[in-house]
Amino acid sequence: MLHLVDYALLKPYLTLEEVVRGAQRAEELGVAAYCVNPVYVPYVRRVLRRVKLCAVVDFPFGAMPTAVRAALVERLADYVEELDIVAPIGLVKSHMWADVRRDLITVVGAAGGRVVKVIVEEPYLTDEERYRLYDIVAESGAHFIKSSTGFAEEGYAKQLGNPIYSTPERAAAIARYIRERGYKLGVKMAGGIRTAEQAKAIIDAIGFGIDPTRVRLGTSTPEVLKT
């Protein structure tokens, strides 16, 4: 199962020493990717050999202007194999779909072919919003829909009737939409995955097998997913 895991250390208070130690642990475990904040990318690049380096972009709010987001993606693409990019959440909630489309096509295009996972922040979305956003993610050329930053605000999510953590039901719904629309997208579930049992239930719910080009699990505790 570890070959499907994106090991993420993204808390804002983590030190360089802690993040580098995490990179060493990622290599030992043999996870799919190690995901860090952009400030640590050049340092972690020196450590990783087998494991792919992933950087988050505009994390966790998705609130920077498109030009800034694209410039950061272009710069990070010199160092990383993968990018987890937060969708422009405010624009999504404002139903400014043309602007959302323009942003994601521009930002994903700046990645130069790197694997891109667009974080849609499921806890904040209505059904109408999530399906419109999935369509735009597919059009943008991204490779994965990623469910959440793992930093969503519980109060707002509850107002919408949404869980803040990953569930098999949500994973199944994303995968079902992808299949129905014929999209060539993978699914990455992140947030609250703490046990091997949880992880297996989510993988089974997605139904894409155990292919890391189609399925990823984001967690800060990859050790518990060893099987």
Curated annotation (Swiss-Prot):
One of its GO terms (biological process) is deoxyribonucleotide catabolic process. The keyword Lyase applies. The active site is at residues 84, 146, 188. The keyword Cytoplasm applies. Keywords: Cytoplasm, Lyase, Schiff base. It is an enzyme of class 4 (lyase). It comes from the Archaea. Belongs to the DeoC/FbaB aldolase family. DeoC type 1 subfamily. PANTHER family: DEOXYRIBOSE-PHOSPHATE ALDOLASE (PTHR10889:SF1). This is Deoxyribose-phosphate aldolase. It comes from Pyrobaculum islandicum (strain DSM 4184 / JCM 9189 / GEO3).
